[in-house]
Amino acid sequence: MYSSYSSLQQSQLAAQGYYDTQSTYLLVYAPGRNTALRATLADQLHRKFRLADTLGSALTEWVDGVLLVSEDVECMSTALMCFAKALQDGADYAVCNAVFGFGGATALYQSRAHLAQNRCALVSRPLLERCRAAAKDPENVTELLALAAQFCAHPARIPQALLHYERDICAEDAFSATGKRAFLMSHVLDMTGAPIVLVSAVPVLRSMGYEVVVLGPSDGGALQLFVDAGAAVITRPGIRATPNLWGLALCSDLVLVNTVVMARTVRALSGTAVPVLWWLHDAFAGYPHIAHQIPTKLAENVRLYSVGHHAANAMHAVRPDFQIGQLIYGLPDYAAEDFPRCDLGYPADKPLFATVGSFERRKGHDIFCAAIRLLPEEVRNKATFLFVGMAADKEMMDAVRSLTTDCPENVFYCKRLSRDEIKNLMEQCTCLVCASRDDPMPTFVTEGLIFGKPSIVSEHTGTAGVITEGVDGFTYPDDDPQKLAALLEWAIFHPEKLAAMKAACRKLYETHYSKQSFEQTLTAAVKELTE
């Protein structure tokens, strides 16, 4: 039994608690083909249930709720227990996440903002009676499911993937029957910049009346951010080479494709009836590997936008004729949130300079390390330096490890911080440093602006184009460690002047990166594309 579950289901089952639900009597109504369902019902931990193919005579006075099943499906052994627990907790309608396809490689995480056309849902007895009274055919399970989703007052979404459909996923599994559909496609769902800022598009699209579904590979940390924002999420490894899932886009009213990495998808959708907004966040470094997949021409249904001039210039280097608008991302005002405060443990009597991002050559960690080494020892010892990020390049990682070994008292490395820890870092640091050789619009620098923290950035970043030198940040040219070191030395001796930049940094955030600014720009772009 256990070995037949998908890897996602196995991991969730290992963390699943047990609930005593045996006092709740469930009816499982599956009038159609139910071979797989019947087999998996034999393994249920919740034993107080009955499988029926008609409702009338089966609806005895002891039935507390009915699991409506319109399609044959395999249930995990904890499925009825979780549905019964939702009923006990006051839900009148409960659905769960699911996996699809052979082996369950595709997973659906239900939206908290809209109810999809679920083919399996638990309905309370009072709600079922209301649905039967309103139905043209009180025995029609599909009609009852649709009415239950419409009439329910207390819906519950169970976070476990309790169901496994052997077929491929379709649009109706994620979208409702009547809403406008926005389909967002991302090549990663990790905590890097592009997926994090894509999250900010979800509430904007929802405010425009769209139901939002996100397609990406397996969760790398950002999936829950999309769910919390109100999107449904579909995951499948290798989506860049899975054209059958791209077909979901053709069932949508708007498609937002994130980054140039999804160029094959744009090529497939160019010339179709669905409007496509292609949002570019990419640096020059990635284009040699992807340029052959970028269409030479784009049909009228595709519009390009970038997070700044740096990202636009990177695309223009290979497709100079493309028209690209500006769509700088917006981030929530984290400083106004009531997040858990904690002391990160770095010396409070020294200015803290931090950089956040994956360790790859274009991010320039070696330049930052070289600049720190160029500081006179007595100057370097007056400050603390922190590197945060996953090691993607051995040379960059070796540069940081060597520096932390030589300067263990004031140079530190952290592989990863949680979102709340990042917010605490931005609140507690003195200045951010982005030494990138090629970076369209570094997210962590923007997060620093939210907390009024200035940054020192390379001229080869998108941020350099919006900074006012010496007012809300600093730039240095030529990827030169010596010039970066000079700015660091000045900053180390003048932390009070960095602190005095707080108001200007906040103004820069509110002008270019706030949710309000982003909402206005994205709304205008979507209306231009769809109206």
Locations of the language-model features?
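Conserved donor NDP-sugar-binding/catalytic core segment of glycosyltransferases
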Residues: 78-105
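Conserved donor-binding/catalytic core segment of Leloir-type glycosyltransferases
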Residues: 179-186, 347-363, 369-372, 386
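Short hydrophobic beta-strand element within catalytic cores of glycosyltransferases
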Residues: 215, 454-457
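Short alpha-helical donor nucleotide-sugar binding micro-motif in glycosyltransferases
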Residues: 249, 416-417, 424-429
